[in-house]
UniProtKB/Swiss-Prot annotation:
Positions of modified residues (Phosphothreonine): 56
Family annotation (Pfam families): Ran_BP1
Keyword Nucleus: yes
One of the record's GO cellular component terms: cytoplasm
Protein name per Swiss-Prot or TrEMBL: Ran-binding protein 3
Biased composition (Low complexity): 274-289, 476-494
Modified residues (N-acetylalanine): 2
Length: 494
């Protein structure tokens, strides 16, 4: 059956027109026999073998051409038939070669050859002496990934190479064993430093000994960089130790550095100390610290005395004009003056208000006055006497409104004293009591004037009238009387 199928089926498929691809490929209902359908398909050029015949002839037929593959795209093939699995029995098969050509493989990556950098660590000897290239290890075998990527032909070639490599490695190992065993020892950084790094004196002695025994040997300082570094560091340390003695230390040798007028005792003591130090030799730093501290304190004291300038002012006797008066009340308050033009209170200042009493020289009557000075500068802002027609009113719990003579304009003005409620109450009570006493005295004097005047008492009455006029002057309307009283107050206050 297989031979008949191969003979009936042509090896090359008939040509297929492009426009005939889209024709209906279904069998007609009338073609019941598979043979009739096969003949009709052959005539049309779209031959499709039946499924049953393809199963029997799938093992022996040639691979279908490109035109047959395109035409049979809609037909379901059995899952066991895979292209290129079973070659035909009659003709030699070319499927493996076609399969190798059609399959895309990744590029074959060869194992990188070992470079000189990878060989430096195992091949390096003591102090960087490298081993010869013949004594290096064999090339490492390829990884399994690279072996899998290579083609079978390359794998077969590589199977022959291990025998050659083994023979070459054996000869290389024998050659390496013949080399000096001292060069085979690997150098590890940080190991055996005691044997390699030595002090200057020891290294120089050993170098002399080696030069005497082996004149061709090099000195260790020429090859070992650690010895060169240690020698330079030790030289620097010795130089720094010598220079440290000359460094500046705070608090030492202040007698030489602080410019102060020297005293005879200090100069002699310093000279004796220097001579004693020169004779006895160098002393310890702890023993030298004690006299230097003393000299530092002495020189500092002398320096401060020389530079300090004391500005002492001469004591001056302070005269306030209140020496003949006795203070009754003093308090901290704020003083305001009423401005008629702006109809507002203007602050005059704050300070200490004092109420003083003084004895009159004429008849022994009591006189009082209010004195206020600003805080700090002690500038006089209020200086007025108390008289009988003086007006006093308590504006609030913390303020008192009074009429007094202004020291600047020599005019009676309205003042406002603002203080605490306690001080305000005490001041108001003291002022009210003294003003009432003055008024009672004026009334008594007026009653004494009422009887008929006597001829011998006329001059005395005129003098009393003049005194009454002076007392009532602040409340009068004439400006001349106010000016006279102001002059009298200023002279009395000063």
């Amino acid at each position: 059956m297989a031979d008949l199928a191969n003979e009936e089926k042509p090896a090359i498929a008939p040509p297929v027109f492009v426009f005939q691809k889209d024709k209906g490929q279904k069998r007609s209902a009338g073609s019941s026999s598979p043979e009739g359908g096969e003949d009709s398909d052959r005539e049309d050029g779209n031959y499709r073998p039946p499924v049953k015949r393809e199963r029997t002839s799938s093992l022996t037929q040639f691979p279908p051409s490109q035109s047959e593959e395109r035409s049979s795209g809609f037909r379901l093939k059995p899952p066991t038939l895979i292209r290129g699995q079973a070659p035909s029995a009659g003709l030699p098969s070319q499927k493996p070669k076609e399969q190798q050509r059609s399959v895309l493989r990744p590029a074959v990556l060869q194992a990188p050859q070992p470079k000189a950098l990878s060989q430096t660590v195992p091949s390096s000897g003591t102090n960087g002496v490298s081993l010869p290239a013949d004594c290096t290890g064999a090339v490492p075998a390829a990884s399994p990934d690279t072996a899998a990527r290579r083609s079978p032909a390359e794998a077969a070639d590589e199977e022959k190479e291990p025998q050659k490599n083994e023979s070459s490695n054996a000869s290389g190992e024998e050659a390496c064993e013949k080399k000096d065993p001292a060069t085979q020892q690997a150098f590890v950084f940080g190991q055996n430093l005691r044997d390699r790094v030595k002090l200057i004196n020891e290294s120089m002695d050993e170098a002399d000994m080696e030069n005497a025994g082996h004149p061709s040997a090099d000195t260790p300082t020429a090859t070992n960089y650690f010895l060169q570094y240690i020698s330079s560091s030790l030289e620097n340390s010795t130089n720094s130790a010598d220079a440290s003695s000359n460094k500046f230390v705070f608090g030492q040798n202040m007698s030489e550095r602080v410019l102060s007028p020297p005293k005879l005792n200090e100069v002699s003591s310093d000279a004796n100390r220097e001579n004693a130090a020169a004779e006895s030799g160098s002393e310890s730093s702890s023993q030298e610290a004690t006299p230097e501290k003393e000299s530092l304190a002495e020189s500092a004291a002398a320096y401060t005395k020389a530079t300090a300038r004391k500005c002492l002012l001469e004591k001056v006797e302070v005269i306030t004009g209140e020496e003949a008066e006795s203070n009754v009340l003093q308090m901290q308050c704020k003083l305001f003056v009423f401005d008629k033009t702006s109809q507002s209170w203007v602050e005059r200042g704050r300070g200490l208000l004092r109420l003083n009493d003084m004895a009159s020289t004429d008849d022994g009557t009591l006189q009082s006055r209010l004195v206020m000075r600003t805080q700090g500068s002690l500038r006089l802002i209020l200086n007025t006497k108390l008289w009988a027609q003086m007006q006093i009113d308590k504006a609030s719990e913390k303020s008192i409104r009074i009429t007094a003579m202004d020291t600047e304009d020599q005019v009676v003005k309205v003042f406002l004293i603002s203080a605490s409620s306690k001080d305000t109450g005490q001041l108001y009570a003291a002022l009210h009591h003294r003003i009432l006493a003055l008024r009672s005295r004026v009334e008594q004097e007026q009653e004494a004037k009422m009887p008929a005047p006597e001829p011998g008492a006329a001059p005395s009455n005129e003098e009393d009238d003049s005194d009454d006029d002076d007392v009532l002057a602040p409340s009068g309307a004439t400006a001349a009387g106010a000016g006279d009283e102001g002059d009298g107050q200023t002279t009395g206050s000063t």
